[in-house]
Curated annotation (Swiss-Prot):
PTM comment, free text: Methylated by PrmB.
Cellular component, GO annotation: cytosolic large ribosomal subunit
S-S pairs: none
Superkingdom assignment: Bacteria
Residues bearing PTM N5-methylglutamine: Q150
UniProt name for this protein: Large ribosomal subunit protein uL3
Gene3D superfamilies to which the protein is assigned, alphabetical: 3.30.160.810, Translation factors
GO biological process, alphabetically ordered: translation
Record keywords: Methylation, Ribonucleoprotein, Ribosomal protein, RNA-binding, rRNA-binding
Source organism (scientific name): Yersinia enterocolitica serotype O:8 / biotype 1B (strain NCTC 13174 / 8081)
Organism placement in taxonomy: Bacteria, Pseudomonadati, Pseudomonadota, Gammaproteobacteria, Enterobacterales
Amino acid sequence: MIGLVGKKVGMTRIFTEDGVSIPVTVIEIEANRVTQVKSLENDGYRAVQVTTGAKKANRVTKPEAGHFAKAGVEAGRGLWEFRLPEGQEFTAGQEISVEIFADVKKVDVTGTSKGKGFAGTVKRWNFRTQDATHGNSLSHRVPGSIGQNQTPGKVFKGKKMAGHLGDERVTVQSLDVVRVDAERNLLLVKGAVPGATGGNLIVKPAVKA
């Protein structure tokens, strides 16, 4: 089963019949329109390309306009691709709704995490701070030593140091599906998902379910 592209609306909570509060993230999944179907013969692999949402006509390039017109769909805010498992078939112009998750218990959600800019090691890697006093007047939040000695005489690749934090692709796995609202194109999942409100999300059935 393929996934769908949605948009993060925000977080809220719902109550069960027993009065238990469940924190949920609301994901709006408008109909995903199939723009292209890739095949083994033509492309070397099986996949389906989809778009969703809308894009202003004056923001659509001519190549994009031709691509959407060929599929007979309205121009969307982007293009996403999902590998097609054996036995599943789609056609260009077809619409896929949030209802495909009606019988799914858990999902994996992929998004772009919030960018935090340049961050130090305490914030980025949870390094502990050094002494506040006892002779330490300058080095409270510095990382400390980053190497050894003349041997190896270098800083190893992957060393945890200060640098850019966030704004990267993150996947949260096996989130419980709490509710599927087909009328309003909403999917409610338990817990938090990556990214800011309004960010694009890719929702797939959980691989570890």
